Amino acid sequence: MRVIKRNLRGDEGEISLVAESLDDLWHLKHLVSPGDLVFATTQRKISGATDKLRPEKAERRTVRLGISVEAVEFHTYSNWLRIHGVIKSGVDIGSYHTLNIEAGSELSIIKRWRPDELQRIEEAVAESNRPRVVLALVEEGEATIGVLRQFGVQTVAEIRGGSGKGSGSSVRDDFLKEVADQIANSAGDDAYVVLAGPGFTKEDLRKVMEARYPDLLKRLTMDDASSTGRSGFQEVLRRGTVDRIVEASRISRETRLMDDLMKEIATDGRAAYGIREVREAANYGAIETLMIVDQLVRRGDVESLIRDVAAGRGRVVIFSTEFEPGERLEALGGVAALLRFRIPGAS
């Protein structure tokens, strides 16, 4: 994400952004809220005064519109962010329109900004300068390949093949070649690759990659995992391999924060969870790190909590419920905190 203009008075005003990736569209989903004013270049059918009786003559033109947002829709598989609302600036004022935002789109958002939203923008800008990471998990006859996004690991391929046991070694060779090709395709010219899995299959796959894609080896890191699939992705993230490659990825950070939280809860330590307990900790000025699932940040009591914690120099981390750490936090009520000191009745 790139910030191209920032014009704020206090916490209100305009920020103009360029969405550079699918991750940025996901961030924008959480930055744009109903009631915000959003400007972007878009396509719209424009009818002249003489064309009103013949709507088929309406011409689709490129125009810049400002809309008052009513709904925001984003699906990771679509590569589009759809912002729907009423036109407030430009042609056909008062009519409804949907802005389709994709990677490369520029838009301006005018609103009252929460501290966590401004922090999210800073994180998105920082993340855009970090390398991409592909996670490849392989065991006999089975492989799962995912791309690490800021909202979680996006599975891009699941491959099944022969193990070579009873079906001939050529079947196994074909399987390994197919997996190697998919990894190379996903990695492109710049992504780092973490290759993991149980047993020695990953070592055999590495040899195939060395023969077929020797230039990729300098970007490849080997690791262990007990299985393929989602649980395997989570295991690799917990081991810290991704952190060593990308410094501190969002998902690895969320996983570690949740692990720290659960340790503190288990030992009756410096932790609070649930809105009532966390609000009490905020009143004491005890919150070091506030952890909230993304689905709750626009709720009134949570929004005021975020502002109070930010004012007290606490850190605010918004968790995605699309991945396992966010699901764990959601099970605790969606709100928790690591504390500077214990407070009466916490945990």
From Swiss-Prot:
Q: What is the lineage of its organism?
A: Archaea, Methanobacteriati, Methanobacteriota, Stenosarchaea group, Methanomicrobia
Q: Which terms in the GO cellular component ontology are assigned?
A: cytoplasm
Record remark on domains: The N-terminal domain has the RNA-binding Sm fold. It harbors the endoribonuclease activity.
What family, per the record? Belongs to the eukaryotic release factor 1 family. Pelota subfamily.
Protein name as catalogued:
Protein pelota homolog
Q: Which organism is it from?
A: Methanothrix thermoacetophila (strain DSM 6194 / JCM 14653 / NBRC 101360 / PT) (Methanosaeta thermophila)
Known role: May function in recognizing stalled ribosomes, interact with stem-loop structures in stalled mRNA molecules, and effect endonucleolytic cleavage of the mRNA. May play a role in the release non-functional ribosomes and degradation of damaged mRNAs. Has endoribonuclease activity.
Q: Which residues cross the membrane?
A: none
Q: Where in the cell is it found?
A: Cytoplasm
- Is Hydrolase one of the keywords? yes
Q: What InterPro entries does UniProt report for this protein, alphabetically?
A: eFR1_2_sf, eRF1_1_Pelota, eRF1_2, eRF1_3, Pelota/DOM34_N, Pelota_arc, Ribosomal_eL30-like_sf, Transl-rel_pelota
Question: Which cofactors, if any, are listed as required?
Answer: a divalent metal cation
Q: Which gene encodes it?
A: pelA
Primary location class: cytoplasm
Q: Which UniProt keywords apply?
A: Cytoplasm, Endonuclease, Hydrolase, Metal-binding, Nuclease
The terms under GO molecular function for this entry are:
endonuclease activity; metal ion binding
What is one Pfam family matched by this protein? eRF1_3
Oligomeric state and partners? Monomer.
Q: Name one GO biological process term.
A: nuclear-transcribed mRNA catabolic process, no-go decay
Q: What is its EC number?
A: 3.1.-.-
